[in-house]
């Protein structure tokens, strides 16, 4: 007898957020039910919450396309990996320039059926 688990995934790439700050929010929703995670993200005040909520809703809609109900979904995995850094220069005194690196990250959320 094979126990086949369905993997539903949504990814946000090149998101203009810090990986560390994004992971702080993702750790709060790992292992939670879909509806509970949406509520948590709505009431948290961190910047990544809005984007993570959009990615989570996208994963939920992917589940609907596969004929699964959102009430039965659990967040199996949620992780953020480093993306490329945007390099900018800021003018400083005496003709110098300081390099500013603006981080990006790739956010992936995997859902499974309860």
UniProtKB/Swiss-Prot annotation:
InterPro entries referenced in this protein's UniProt entry, alphabetically: Ribosomal_uL22, Ribosomal_uL22_bac/chlpt-type, Ribosomal_uL22_bac/org-type, Ribosomal_uL22_CS, Ribosomal_uL22_sf
Q: Which domain of life is it from?
A: Eukaryota
PROSITE patterns to which the protein is assigned, alphabetical: RIBOSOMAL_L22
Residues annotated as transmembrane: none
Instruction: Cite a single GO BP annotation.
Output: translation
Q: Where is the major localization of this protein?
A: plastid
An example of a Gene Ontology cellular component annotation for this protein is: chloroplast
What subcellular compartments does it reside in?
Plastid, Chloroplast
Pfam families (alphabetical) = Ribosomal_L22
Q: Which UniProt keywords apply?
A: Chloroplast, Plastid, Ribonucleoprotein, Ribosomal protein, RNA-binding, rRNA-binding
Q: Please give one Gene Ontology molecular function term for this protein.
A: rRNA binding
NCBIfam families on file: rplV_bact
**Assembly notes:** Part of the 50S ribosomal subunit.
Give the record's family classification.
Belongs to the universal ribosomal protein uL22 family.
Q: What does this protein do?
A: This protein binds specifically to 23S rRNA.
Task: Quote the protein name from its UniProt record.
Answer: Large ribosomal subunit protein uL22c
């Amino acid at each position: 007898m094979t126990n086949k688990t369905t993997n539903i995934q949504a990814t946000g790439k090149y998101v203009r957020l810090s990986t560390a700050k994004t992971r702080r929010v993702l750790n709060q929703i790992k292992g939670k039910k879909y509806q509970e995670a949406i509520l948590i993200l709505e009431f948290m005040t961190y910047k990544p919450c809005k984007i993570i909520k959009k990615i989570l809703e996208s994963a939920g809609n992917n589940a609907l396309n596969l004929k699964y109900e959102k009430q039965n979904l659990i967040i199996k995995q949620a992780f953020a990996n480093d993306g490329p850094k945007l390099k900018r220069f800021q003018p400083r005194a005496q003709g110098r320039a300081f390099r500013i690196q603006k981080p990006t990250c790739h956010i992936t959320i995997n859902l499974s059926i309860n």
